[in-house]
Amino acid sequence: MTTIIPELTDAQLADLPSQAEAKVYRALRDGLPRDFVVFFQVGWILRREEEQAKDGETDFVVCHPDLGYVCIEVKGGGVGFDSSSGEWFSIDRHHQKHAINNPVNQALKAKYSIRSKLNEYQRWRDLSLANVLRGHAVFFPDVGDANALSRPDMPSTLIGCAKDLHDPKAWIDAVFAHWG
């Protein structure tokens, strides 16, 4: 079992607003070995030169000392992409369609924001780890087939789905291999 921060009880997971995130939390916690460290609901404030400070957040950051880190954005329910409009949406249990933020862009921005945030710290810069592997992926735990959502900017390897909840290690290995 991996280390996951923060460590939540089953009661706390049941109270999360996103049960999709709770599903992925349990899968990563129980399915990754000890050499991984997973951070859940990571937030930051980032200021770039003359710009205003901006808040950021990612659902999961999966870290490995030899592999690097991957930022994962999770979306629950039926998730789809309308290629004619470029819009992402979810479908709830009442079959209602809801526009959602682009999860691919969210994960991509998180990947670079975390790198920028780390580079703010002299201790990190002193480590000379400029080439740490970093990647991004999305996880849709209520979707059965990742291939249906594959796009040029998000190949199916980088899309976790319901079947990957049963073997998250294989999926994470494939994600790191894609970026490595």
Q: What spans do the regions from the language model cover?
A:
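Intrinsically disordered, low-complexity Ser/Thr/Pro/Gly-rich regulatory segments
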Residues: 1-180
